[in-house]
Design a protein with these regions (language model features):
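Bacterial N-terminal signal peptides
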Residues: 16-25
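Primarily auto-inhibitory N-terminal propeptides
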Residues: 28-148, 163
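Protease zymogen maturation seam
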Residues: 35, 91-95, 115-172, 180-189, ...
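Hydrolase catalytic cores
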Residues: 242-246, 258, 265-273, 305, ...
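C-terminal subdomain of the subtilisin-like protease fold in secreted/lumenal serine endopeptidases
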Residues: 266, 286-289, 294-309, 315-318, ...
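Active-site-adjacent substrate-recognition loops and nearby beta-strands
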Residues: 280, 314, 335-355, 359-377, ...
Length: 469
């Protein structure tokens, strides 16, 4: 949904998403900050929030002033069991907002009260929930013998003719996901990445952020992710997504990648029970070549970011600012539309401006029953029964394997791969807005039904490559 076009540095400088209105913003006192309530229903209890203080305000420049402001707000909140609420500063994000954490979980009403009281400070620009995002897939135990999405049917992405002239050479795709596992059909195309999970428990490596993006497993036990949550095996979601983009090809092994000569920068932001918005937005900035405090510079800035993740609610300021930051550096941001069979306007970050929002279709060319839809879907890609690289471990990593998954998580990397193909043959790197326009103008009609909005059609690799300037 591009609405800006930004210049891009020449490719030789590389080794290798305007702010939308927030429909859930509600009125607050005059001169106070905006309150985005869209994340309040995302979790049964809430304890992490993101606050952006206005540039130049005392709270923005003085930790002591910010601490005094937070203590003042906390003192107005009702005590529980005789204990006052604690409100602590965790860290500053790459774009200058502050991550806050309460010392106990709050219900929806308590969290809304806290957010409104924080926003009543005239120095606050906005406040929102540090929402948890999740991989956007529906696992399928059936393994297919072929990759229909890369085939020759009218429902495929029509990639085989494109491979005669474009294979993704020289293009870096950042995959913000669960990390990656070692796989003989992937390893040769993987560059150094980073682990952005700041919560050591969620990360399972006991040390928070570090330079190792290896997927430690995202298995959960019953109740671990909230009351009533079920147990689940590790998904190895990032490995599956990466394989669809750039699995090694012509090696007489396994599967093919859409852009099989592109390189993957794996960025770990999802762990046990998902991943926090504050970690993901830092990952977006870093992936595109921006600076993140305490994290070494990314030696391989991405021309494409794939985010097969999301959660409920409209686009938050944190997401939009991070996406705009990436787009300003020339990085195209591809996002899964979500698997709720609902309007994408209520799913984030797919509802953000300046992203390519991707719906899922079946091998018959119809909208997948689970796929989100709507007027802001940009394009569709194969997302039902998609075979790709995986791992056999049910909890911690086991041996390399292959499996079929369903989800808009699987559709998005097909599109990200096509973007890599396009950039690899462009005479100079295309702006994100130009990439989106090219994909829409060359898309093929869906041969099946989608009455609710599936964008311009099925992404058409050969058509896009042939019309790349």
């Amino acid at each position: 949904m591009s609405n800006v076009s930004q210049p891009r540095a020449p490719r030789c400088a590389l080794v290798v998403l305007g702010v939308s209105a927030l429909t859930s913003l509600l009125a607050v006192p005059a001169f106070a900050g905006q309150v985005n309530l869209s994340g309040l229903d995302s979790q049964p209890t809430l304890e992490r929030f993101i606050v952006k203080y206005k540039d130049g305000s005392s709270a923005a420049v003085s930790p002591t002033s910010m601490r005094a402001s937070l203590n003042s707000v906390a003192s107005t909140m009702p005590a529980r069991a005789g204990r006052a609420l604690g409100l602590n500063h965790v860290r500053r994000t790459a774009l200058g907002s502050e991550v806050l954490k309460t010392d106990r979980g709050l219900d929806r009403a308590e969290a809304e009260t806290l957010m409104r009281r924080i926003a009543a400070d005239p120095s606050v620009d906005y406040v929102e929930v540090d929402q948890i995002m999740y991989p956007v897939l529906t696992p399928n135990d059936t393994r297919l013998s072929e990759q229909w999405g890369l085939g020759t049917s009218s429902s495929s992405i029509n990639v085989r003719p494109a491979w005669d002239t474009a294979t993704g050479t020289g293009v870096v795709v950042a995959v913000i996901d669960t990390g990656i596992t070692s796989h003989p059909d992937l390893n040769a195309n993987v560059l150094p990445g980073y682990d952005f999970i700041s919560d050591a428990t969620r990360a399972r490596d006991n040390n928070g952020r570090d330079s190792n993006p290896a997927d430690q497993g995202d298995w959960t036990t019953a109740g671990q992710c909230g009351s009533g949550s079920s147990a689940s095996n590790s998904s190895w979601h990032g490995t599956h997504v990466a394989g669809t983009i750039a699995a090694v090809t012509n090696n007489s092994t396994g599967v093919a990648g859409t852009a099989f000569n592109a390189r993957i920068v794996p960025i770990r932001a999802l762990g046990a029970c998902g991943g926090s918005t504050s970690d993901i937005v830092d990952a977006i900035v870093w992936a595109s070549g921006g600076a993140v405090s305490g994290v070494p510079a990314n030696a391989n800035p991405a021309e494409v970011i794939n985010m097969s993740l999301g959660g409920s609610g409209s686009c938050s300021s944190s997401y939009q600012n991070a996406i705009n930051s990436a787009v300003s550096r020339g990085t195209t941001v591809v996002v899964a539309a979500g698997n709720s069979n609902a309007n994408v306007a209520n799913f984030t970050p797919a509802s953000c401006a300046n992203v390519i929002s991707v719906a899922s279709i079946t091998s018959a060319g119809a909208r997948s029953s689970f796929s989100n839809f709507g007027s802001t879907i940009d394009i569709s890609g194969p997302g039902s029964a998609i075979l790709s690289t995986l791992n056999s471990g049910t909890t911690t990593p086991g041996s390399a394997s292959y499996a079929s998954y369903n989800g808009t998580s699987m559709a998005a990397p097909h599109v990200a791969g096509v973007v890599a193909l396009v950039q690899s043959v462009a005479s100079r790197p295309l702006t994100p807005a130009a990439v989106e326009t090219l994909l829409k103008n060359t898309a093929r009609p869906l041969p099946g039904a989608c009455s609710a909005g599936c964008g311009a059609g099925i992404v058409n690799a050969a058509g896009a490559v042939s019309q790349t300037p």
